[in-house]
């Protein structure tokens, strides 16, 4: 298997009413940083957009930034940008989406393969944010020759968390997952929820819960055929 570098982010919330220009600068910094880090692919794990009513200008900005970056970008819809009949991803600006943009759009889960990288990316697009939606249900078995990276947008239940939550992810599900790396979204802060042999991380919002104006935070995951999978928080200048 090839050695890969993956930039993992989530919860960019483009189109928010709070500091919209800062959100754009942060998004641009993520893509520029991925290029500088020589990443092979960028993962955006849900809540790319703040809501389904964002202006077309915001969607056009997103599409243009992906096109300019010219690096594979995989998007998983989350609870703020659900993938259904009226999804933001069906709107006109996406009719001109660049070939390096990949959207996981199957509510039952799908694989997007990158043969040149030896990489399979899997995820379930969220149709509704309810306790019945299980973000990593149906994850496939990996093939011998490819890395399998899974994307999931939902709430991880620590052992003492017994409340009923929407889009739940449980420790035993992570421990028994078939993927090499589980890229998570939904939480604003970066959290390591690895379990067993599976590396699993929330990237957190790029601007963080405290909304800094100077840097963005992402996860840099490295998949190495000899040493295995590592992941660490990485700060990029805005």
Name each region found by the language model.
Residues 1-63, 135:
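N-terminal active-site segment of His-dependent metallophosphoesterases
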Residues 2, 117, 227-229:
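Residue-level signal for beta-strand positions within conserved beta-sheet cores that form or flank
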Residues 7, 120-122, 219:
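Conserved beta-strand elements of the Class I
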Residues 34-38, 69, 142-145, 220, ...:
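Glycine-rich phosphate-binding loop signature in dinucleotide/nucleotide-binding domains
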Residues 42, 182, 231-234:
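Generic beta-strand hydrophobic packing signal
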Residues 45, 61-64, 192, 220-224:
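A general secondary-structure boundary signal
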Residues 52-210, 215:
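His/Asp/Glu-rich metal-coordinating catalytic cores
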Residues 210-238:
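C-terminal functional module detector
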């Amino acid at each position: 298997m090839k050695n890969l570098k993956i930039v993992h982010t989530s919860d960019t919330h483009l189109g928010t009413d709070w500091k919209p220009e800062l959100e754009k600068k942060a998004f641009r910094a993520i893509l520029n940083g991925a290029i500088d880090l020589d990443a092979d692919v960028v993962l955006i794990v849900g809540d790319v957009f703040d809501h389904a009513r964002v202006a077309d200008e915001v969607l056009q900005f997103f599409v243009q930034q992906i096109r300019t970056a010219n690096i594979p970008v995989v998007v998983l819809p989350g609870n703020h940008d659900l993938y259904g009949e009226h999804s933001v991803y069906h709107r006109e600006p996406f009719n001109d989406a660049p070939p390096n943009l990949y959207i996981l759009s199957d509510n039952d889960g799908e694989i997007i393969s990158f043969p040149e990288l030896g990489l399979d990316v899997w995820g379930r697009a969220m149709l509704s944010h309810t306790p019945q939606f299980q973000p990593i249900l149906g994850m496939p078995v990996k093939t011998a020759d490819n890395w399998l990276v899974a994307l999931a947008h939902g709430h991880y239940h620590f052992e003492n968390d017994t409340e009923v939550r929407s889009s739940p992810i449980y420790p035993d599900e992570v421990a028994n997952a078939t993927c090499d790396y589980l890229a998570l979204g939904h939480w604003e802060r970066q959290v390591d929820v690895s379990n067993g042999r599976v590396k699993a991380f929330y990237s957190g919002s790029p601007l963080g819960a405290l909304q800094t104006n100077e840097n963005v935070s992402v996860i840099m995951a490295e998949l190495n055929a000899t040493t295995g999978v590592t992941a660490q928080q990485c700060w990029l200048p805005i």
